[in-house]
């Protein structure tokens, strides 16, 4: 399968799994992107924020985790689902 740009892979992942935190997103993508320089929490967080800014993702929950870190959960929006049509055919179910 063709490797997607990480932003689109995050979007695709959230079309398959709901209410994921950044840590859960990173755990799901570690095998594909774990060796890349962009696979850092700060960079992935900026990707998520940019997808939220254009309306492709939304925050579904905000809470403090066990380490007292502010944590958000994310879902894909209807608009984001509509953008999946631009993925390579092998990524579209």
Task: Give residue spans per PLM region.
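Hydrophobic residues on short alpha-helical segments
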Residues: 7-14
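A short, conserved structural fragment
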Residues: 52-63
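Short, hydrophobic-biased segments on the C-terminal half of alpha helices
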Residues: 45-52
